[in-house]
């Protein structure tokens, strides 16, 4: 009987310790300047965020009227963004021109994005689709009015299948079809390598480089 009482006492002490650990962990997270940590993570990847107003809540950050710059160029703008801490994840919602897009980052190692008429980047007129990044890239995405240094591509449809992708490109009334490979860099997603080609009607478009430095060749 004494052994049982001792075991219960140890269990209660362990439970109290675990509860205290979780409580003080959440408390420190709630009081920590989360935007500074978030901003530091962006700067490490040469991404700079400017917002007119920042509001920090206990488990979330709200950003109002901001822009994101990458490699000294404007990458996107937004009217409102909210980043919330979930169970083993960080969830984000981006509001721009009345449309909401979502992104979810899991601490288990995956990222999921959902775009709904996203039109807040100078490089693309509109983006729709869903993409999941885990051991590879999965999902579909449609880009309308994609601007390159060489030409304006009317529409791009891509289907990601892990380490490969297939799709089509509409350009000057022509439809080019092709495929390619993605060599994923888990430590730095923007350094993942891309090698793809689209052909049709005697025209060939070659895409090579990394996600942060894509080069488009037309022949």
Curated annotation (Swiss-Prot):
It is a single-pass membrane protein. One of its GO terms (molecular function) is DNA ligase activity. InterPro entries: DNA_ligase_ATP-dep_CS. The chain crosses the membrane at residues 13-32. Keywords: Membrane, Transmembrane, Transmembrane helix. It comes from the Bacteria. It is found in: Membrane. One of its GO terms (cellular component) is membrane. This is Uncharacterized protein aq_1287.
